[in-house]
Amino acid sequence: MIVDTNALSAAADDDPAVIAVLTRAGQMAIPVIVLGEYRYGIAQSRHCATYENWLTALLRDCAVLDINKPTTQHYAEITLDLRRKGKPIPTNDLWIAALCRQHSLPLLSRDRHFDQVTGLKRLGW
């Protein structure tokens, strides 16, 4: 399962619903984009050290998904499809969606705009 920034934040705050979903999923992957967004949030937090320590521990046990050439093809297809539908989504989320499609993994996110992406399964909590 791939996690979006809002799911990662909820997990860091011990949201029981998110923890339950992640426990059932077994493996978790974090897109490099999500890692950047989350670290930006940490930098603004009063609890910076606590969240950075939590993230460091988490990263020992989960994959970080990088963007590569195949990702760019998925990105282009998704962006074009959503533009044609008149339903654009934020650029970072396009990259996250592209990684989900590339790796055939569902996305844990509260952002319903991911539901517009053909071939992507979004899980909420």
Where do the language-model regions lie?
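Short, well-structured N-terminal submotif of metal-dependent ribonuclease cores
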Residues: 1-30, 41-59
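Histidine- and aromatic-rich ligand-binding microenvironments
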Residues: 3-4, 31, 88-90, 111
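Generic structural signal for small/hydrophobic residues in well-ordered secondary structure
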Residues: 4-5, 38, 75, 100
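A generic structural signal for short hydrophobic patches within well-formed alpha-helices
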Residues: 8, 35-38, 72, 114
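A general structural signal for well-ordered alpha-helical segments in protein cores
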Residues: 35, 48, 52-55, 72-75, ...
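Active-site neighborhoods of divalent-metal-dependent phosphate/nucleic-acid chemistry enzymes
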Residues: 63-108
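Acidic, PIN/NYN-like endoribonuclease modules and their adjacent C-terminal/linker elements
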Residues: 97, 101-125
